[in-house]
Amino acid sequence: MVKIRLTRGGAKKRPFYHIIVTDVRSARDGRNIERLGYYNPVAQGAEPRVVLDVARVDHWVGQGAQLTDKVRNLYREASKSQAAAA
């Protein structure tokens, strides 16, 4: 089964997450199929908090991929921000 989930990066006490497509059997920071965007929970000022390729997420969901709860919330946030920007 394929999931769209977060993988952690960044430094100690400065988390940064990549939003990836991966097999459920892979480790959290292990091998991925495709990188779809990123999530920066400690963004400041004009830095974007969520950058996500919504079209690719729709593609993978159409192929049967499942989103984790956090990624589902980030997807909604990214969709709203893209709609507001357009």
Curated annotation (Swiss-Prot):
GO terms for biological process: translation. Disulfide bonds: none annotated. GO terms for cellular component: cytoplasm; small ribosomal subunit. Signal peptide: none annotated. Transmembrane segments: none annotated. InterPro entries: Ribosomal_bS16, Ribosomal_bS16_CS, Ribosomal_bS16_dom_sf. Belongs to the bacterial ribosomal protein bS16 family. This is Small ribosomal subunit protein bS16. It comes from Xanthomonas campestris pv. campestris (strain ATCC 33913 / DSM 3586 / NCPPB 528 / LMG 568 / P 25).
